[in-house]
């Protein structure tokens, strides 16, 4: 088995558990160049809030969009946007990625700026 398949299997297991909880999810995805974060509704149909380093507003603040500094900015922005929509409690969906590095930084900054998970 390759790395991508193993990550996808971990993600499916985690998403099944979160679906049974029935809570709003903070979904994180990382690529080599960018970080993406979305808050998805309980029924998995609607994206309520989103932030990523592909947005001009966020990318203009950064020199490089694929590092820990970029993850911190995305975490801050997603938390601020969620707070404006009245979302405080979420479940953290790391999409099968290890809770380390950029994923961990994004989560810490989202917590620091008001999200609870």
Swiss-Prot record:
Keyword match RNA-binding: yes
Gene Ontology cellular-component terms listed: cytosolic large ribosomal subunit
One MF term in the entry's GO annotations: structural constituent of ribosome
Leader sequence segment: none
Keyword tags: Ribonucleoprotein, Ribosomal protein, RNA-binding, rRNA-binding
Record-linked InterPro entries: Ribosomal_uL18_bac-type, Ribosomal_uL18_bac/euk
Gene3D superfamilies for this protein: 3.30.420.100
Origin superkingdom: Bacteria
CDD domains: Ribosomal_L18_L5e
UniProt keyword rRNA-binding present: yes
HAMAP family: Ribosomal_uL18_B (MF_01337_B)
Protein name (Swiss-Prot/TrEMBL): Large ribosomal subunit protein uL18
Encoding gene per record: rplR
